[in-house]
């Protein structure tokens, strides 16, 4: 035997159900943006005029672009990153070279901090809870490689891309007793380069 319900109860029940369906649709629709990984990032090409010569290898970097990570893979809070194409060549040398993230430093005269964390992206860790970046780049003799270099600027509550549009940014590479400096006058500018 069926029970009768009032019109008011019927409308409240169907309204709540419709609201739940709409909310789940919105959450499903935005899930991809919050689970973003750097897999699909494309870095701007490097300018061949900006190459620095270390004697046994050359290095070059393109202009910076920006990416904000997912809190899912960053311990609960999203991070801001700069990234750029980074090219290394040993084409005119019989030697191979390995460059580590520790050979590179980032500085900004406007006070923003950043740490070079990756020379290419590997994927997620086995638990699917954290990004895994390559911390070194090895280039064999008479060879060349281009990877995406990643700079972690910190959490979104402590860093801002906006501050990088003013002031000067530098990326410094120290290797083989030499120091190369790539200088950016703004976030969207190609760098100038020098070596000593």
Where are the predicted features?
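Conserved functional micro-motifs across diverse proteins
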Residues: 2-4, 13, 31-196
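N-terminal export signals
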Residues: 3, 9-30
């Amino acid at each position: 035997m069926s029970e009768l319900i009032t019109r008011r109860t019927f409308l409240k029940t169907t309204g709540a159900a419709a609201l739940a369906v709409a909310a789940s649709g919105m959450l499903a629709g935005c899930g991809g943006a919050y689970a973003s990984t750097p897999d699909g990032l494309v870095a701007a090409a490097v300018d061949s005029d900006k190459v620095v010569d270390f004697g046994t290898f050359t290095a070059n970097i393109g202009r910076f672009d920006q990416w904000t990570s997912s809190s899912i893979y960053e311990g609960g809070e999203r991070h801001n990153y700069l990234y750029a194409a980074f090219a290394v060549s040993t084409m005119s040398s019989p030697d191979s070279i390995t460059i580590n993230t520790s050979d590179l430093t980032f500085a900004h005269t406007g006070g923003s901090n950043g740490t070079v964390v990756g020379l290419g992206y590997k994927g997620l860790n086995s638990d699917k809870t954290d990004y895994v970046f390559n911390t070194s780049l090895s280039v064999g003799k008479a060879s060349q490689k281009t990877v995406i270099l990643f700079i972690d600027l910190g959490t979104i509550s402590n860093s801002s891309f906006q501050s990088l549009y003013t002031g000067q940014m530098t990326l410094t590479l120290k290797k083989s007793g030499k120091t190369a400096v790539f200088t950016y006058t703004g976030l969207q500018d190609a760098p100038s380069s020098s070596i000593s």
